[in-house]
Amino acid sequence: MSTKNEQLFAQARKHIPGGVNSPVRAFAGVGGTPIFMHRANGSKIYDTEDNAYIDYVGSWGPMILGHAHPKVIDAVKKAADDGLSFGTPTPFETTVADKICEIVPSVEMIRMTSSGTEATMSAIRLARGYTQRDKIVKFEGCYHGHSDSLLVKAGSGMLDIGEPTSKGVPADFAKHTITIPYNDPQAIKDCFEKWGEEIACVILEPIAGNMNMVIPSQEFHDTLRAECTANGAVLIFDEVMTGFRVGLGGAQAHFGIDPDLTCFGKIIGAGLPVGAFGGKKDIMSCIAPLGGVYQAGTLSGNPLAMRAGIAMFEDLTAEGFYDELSAKVDHLVDGFQAAADKHGINMRTNKLGGMFGMFFVKDSATTVPQNFDDVTECDMELFNTFFHGMLDRGIYLAPSAYEAGFMSIKHSNEDIEATIKAADEIFAEMAKA
């Protein structure tokens, strides 16, 4: 690690808690000093000494077109020339809303926010207002932002009311949140049998991108939809990570499930700060000014993010875009798996559309993880070794074994081959250790 980078981190720690503005950036999970970046272009991100890294984080998902895409940058420059924020309705937010509703059939109306956390927080408030119920259900290992109701883990029993995972969250808030195992249809049935008439909503990542990448069974989703419908609960898909990433229609299109509400993140603004939640018209009509559920934001639907999103959707909706993106992921992940197998490394992978996951499992008999407990059983030290080996070779992966990877359309065959070659070298070293 360069002395300059260590100096930057020390300087940051003087006035920024932990030296970062989001905990995962601190490299606490993998060890070492975080790298400070100052620019990016295409498939690559550059540190402050202008060393290039092939980037598979993509600002945690939204850089699906690659960094600094000319069309997006041009749209943002033109938007900035016209004024940064108006605090009024604009035609641009209507265009983005129309486009999302056209692409995602379950979304009949949509409201813009400034972040994914705002989107999930608002969707839950809306579900509670719509149903006139208090309890919400979430799943172990799913992350939905840092609002108080969602920073909750399972209690001592599987169907207990949750307890906070963060200091500063009152127990009175947490008592309304029920946390159950992910990808477990029976747990859903048991939960509704016990609490059904009190449950306002169930919120989940339809593909979990915050426990690396766990793809649940079709039965899991079918059970969720059936139980929510039977008990009058609102089904909320948090597609902040999967929306427009695993496919144009998101995870809900992949599974053929229509949620009642869907949350989106910064991908709809091509990486600028933005979020959204939308769904059935009768539910969305409960939002102010039409209904009694209050939600607002000075920067919601800001013109820079909306105009960037309009430019991005032009490419996402082009014929063959997701076929090409998926082929790149197949190339990378299949190469990883082949290299791991060659050297006897116990690695399992998942992939769909532009997302992928890698798990260093304990032994050759262990299959790909199916839930949070499975992920926590993986070899975190081996992942850390892999992460730093890749970083030393100019490959930037998420600095956590619990985060998914992302491909952009700008990753070239040369980028992918270089990444596979680096992985092969590290696996060879691991095999000798």
UniProtKB/Swiss-Prot annotation:
GO terms for molecular function: glutamate-1-semialdehyde 2,1-aminomutase activity; pyridoxal phosphate binding; transaminase activity. It is an enzyme of class 5 (isomerase). The modification N6-(pyridoxal phosphate)lysine is found at residue 266. InterPro entries: 4pyrrol_synth_GluAld_NH2Trfase, Aminotrans_3, Aminotrans_3_PPA_site, PyrdxlP-dep_Trfase, PyrdxlP-dep_Trfase_major, PyrdxlP-dep_Trfase_small. Its cofactor is pyridoxal 5'-phosphate. Transmembrane segments: none annotated. Keywords: Cytoplasm, Isomerase, Porphyrin biosynthesis, Pyridoxal phosphate. Pathway: Porphyrin-containing compound metabolism; protoporphyrin-IX biosynthesis; 5-aminolevulinate from L-glutamyl-tRNA(Glu): step 2/2. Belongs to the class-III pyridoxal-phosphate-dependent aminotransferase family. HemL subfamily. NCBIfam families: hemL (TIGR00713), PRK00062.1 (NF000818). Homodimer. This is Glutamate-1-semialdehyde 2,1-aminomutase. It comes from Psychrobacter cryohalolentis (strain ATCC BAA-1226 / DSM 17306 / VKM B-2378 / K5). The gene is hemL.
